[in-house]
C-alpha cells in the first residue's frame, strides 16, 4: 500500500502542520467596549503576522491592535465617536466616503475579519441601509452599518520591497505560519509516495485530472478542472 499524500497528512492536523499559536502575541480583536480612549505605548513585531502590532493602554488594560501607518508611540486613539483619524475605531456609518479602513467586522461585535494584511486597506464607497466597501480584491462588498472598522492603512506596506535574499530567511519567515518553503513535486517521487511518481521519467504518465468526489488518496493533480474555453 502506498504512503499517504502530503495533503492527507496535513489534514490530520499534526503539530508540524499547525500554526505555532503559542508563539503568537495575542488574538487581534477590536475592543469589546463601545466607547473609550487609549494611548499607544509601544509598537512591536509579532511572529506569524505580516504587520507590526500596537500595544495600547485603555485605562490600565493592555490591548493589542494592528499598527496603523502614520501612528506613533504616545498617540491617543479612540473607540466609538465620529472623529476620523488614523488608528481610531468606530462604526461604519460614522466614516465618510473615500476613507481608507481595515480590520472590518463581518457582523457587529465579531472583532474584525477583513483586511488585516500589512499595507492593505479598503475604501468606503457609499452609506445607506448597507455600507458598500471597495475591498483590496477590487470587489464591492456590503456591510451592516453597525459593523466597526479601524481607520487608516495597515502598517508594514513596504515589507516586500526588501528581498529575502537567503533561503534561511525564507524558511524562518514561513515557519512562523507553519508553511514549508520547499515542495517536492510528485513526478520526482517514487511510485509508493505519490500517484505521479515512478517510471523513471519526469512526467505523470497518465491522466492527471481527478473527480471532485475522488477519494483523498487519488486527489493529486488537477481537481475537477473546467474545460478550456475555445476562442
Question: How would you describe each model-predicted region?
Answer:
Residues 58, 67, 126:
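Conserved strand-loop elements at the edges of beta-sheets that form or border functional pockets
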Residues 61-72:
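Beta-strand/loop nucleic-acid-binding surfaces
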Residues 58-61, 136-138:
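Glycine-centered tight beta-turn/hairpin loop motif at sheet-sheet or coil-to-beta transitions
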Amino acid at each position: 500500500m502506498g504512503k499517504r499524500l502530503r495533503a492527507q497528512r496535513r489534514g490530520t492536523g499534526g503539530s508540524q502542520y499547525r500554526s505555532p499559536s503559542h508563539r503568537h502575541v495575542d488574538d487581534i480583536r477590536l475592543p469589546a467596549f463601545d466607547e473609550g480612549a487609549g494611548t499607544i505605548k509601544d509598537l512591536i513585531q509579532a511572529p506569524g503576522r505580516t504587520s507590526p502590532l500596537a500595544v495600547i493602554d485603555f485605562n490600565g488594560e493592555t490591548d493589542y491592535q494592528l499598527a496603523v501607518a502614520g501612528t506613533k508611540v504616545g498617540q491617543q486613539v479612540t473607540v466609538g465617536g465620529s472623529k476620523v483619524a488614523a488608528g481610531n475605531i468606530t462604526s461604519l456609518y460614522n466614516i465618510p466616503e473615500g476613507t481608507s479602513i481595515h480590520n472590518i467586522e463581518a457582523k457587529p461585535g465579531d472583532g474584525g475579519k477583513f483586511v488585516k494584511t500589512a499595507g492593505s486597506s479598503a475604501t468606503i464607497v457609499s452609506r445607506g441601509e448597507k455600507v458598500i466597501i471597495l475591498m483590496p480584491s477590487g470587489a464591492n462588498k456590503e456591510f451592516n452599518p453597525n459593523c466597526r472598522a479601524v481607520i487608516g492603512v495597515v502598517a508594514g506596506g513596504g515589507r516586500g520591497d526588501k528581498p529575502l535574499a537567503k533561503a534561511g530567511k525564507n524558511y524562518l519567515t514561513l515557519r512562523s505560519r507553519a508553511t514549508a518553503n520547499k515542495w517536492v513535486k510528485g513526478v520526482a517521487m517514487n511510485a509508493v509516495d505519490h500517484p505521479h511518481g515512478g517510471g523513471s521519467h519526469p512526467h505523470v504518465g497518465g491522466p492527471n485530472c481527478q473527480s471532485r468526489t475522488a477519494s483523498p488518496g487519488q486527489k493529486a493533480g488537477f481537481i475537477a478542472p473546467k474545460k478550456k474555453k475555445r476562442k
